[in-house]
Structures are given as C-alpha cells and as structure tokens.
C-alpha cells in the first residue's frame, strides 16, 4: 500500500490492511450489496462480536467489516489473538463453536429467519466438533479414544451427503 501511495514508509494502517488481506482476502468493493443484505450481514457479524466479547476464553475483536471479500465472505469479524497458545482446551473449543454460530443465531433472533450466510461458520464449527470427538477424545459419551486418521474409519465420521 505504501508503494502504491508513493510513500517510502509504511503506516500502522498499511500493516492492518495487509494483515486483513492475507487473513481474510481483499475487499471486493465493486460488488453491489442491497441495504437488506448489508443489514443482515451487520447483525450476523455483531452476533460473532458479542460472543467474542462476553465469552471468557475468546480473544478481543480486532476488526469487523460488512464489505464482501474476494474469498466469498459477505463480511467478517476478526479477533486479535492475545497469546500464541500451543494447546486448546475443551472449554475454549466449545466457545469457538459458540462464537462461530453466533452470527446465525443473531440472524434468527433479529429477522426471524436464517440465511445461507453462515455456511462457512457451520462448516468450521462442524470441523471443530468432529476433531474434538474423533481426534482429541473430548466426548463425554465416547471417552478417550481416537477414531481413525484422516477419515480412514469406515463407519464413523464420514460425510453421508
């Protein structure tokens, strides 16, 4: 950004934009979004942000946007990790799932309906839940056991659709 702006130095804003571009994807400002979709996206992202704020193990929110990205997201809520943790706890992973689903819940509470906007959130929440059970032995019902490596189990953990 600095070079494009003709500057020989970088600013904090340049670093922020680069961080977001690498982590989320470039903003796609050319995409025309209706006011209704902007409102849905804003409430969806607010649902995530509220949970980042109130759940004890979640990182603080770094930035929120309702501008679509080149990677297909209608918006995003990006936390800023406070630590570089090597391990995740079961409680933290459950809070991650809760936060991922917060956007979908906000849509339902505010609009009385849901959209397809949470599809990636649901995919990520499912991946976390599956790993908790199949890799980390975090299921209260199934106990301390790992179910196959990389989906090589025939009857457990395969996608049915």
Regions found by a protein language model. Give the residues of each.
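C-terminal helical "lid" subdomain and adjoining coupling/linker elements of P-loop NTPases
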Residues: 2-15, 21-40, 136-144
């Amino acid at each position: 950004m600095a070079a494009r702006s003709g500057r020989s130095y970088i600013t904090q804003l340049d670093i922020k934009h680069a961080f977001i571009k690498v982590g989320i994807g470039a903003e796609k400002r050319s995409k025309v979004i209706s006011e209704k979709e902007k409102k849905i996206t804003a409430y969806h992202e607010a649902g995530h942000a509220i949970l980042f704020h109130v759940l004890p193990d979640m990182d603080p929110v770094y930035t929120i946007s309702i501008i679509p990205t080149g990677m297909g997201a209608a918006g995003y809520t990006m936390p800023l990790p406070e630590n570089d943790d090597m391990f995740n706890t079961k409680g933290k992973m459950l809070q991650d799932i809760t936060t991922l689903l917060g956007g979908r819940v906000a849509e339902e509470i505010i609009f009385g309906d849901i959209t397809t906007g949470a599809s990636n959130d649901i995919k990520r929440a499912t991946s976390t839940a599956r790993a908790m059970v199949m890799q980390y032995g975090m299921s209260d019902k199934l106990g301390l056991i790992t179910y196959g490596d990389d989906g090589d189990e025939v009857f457990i953990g395969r996608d049915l659709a």
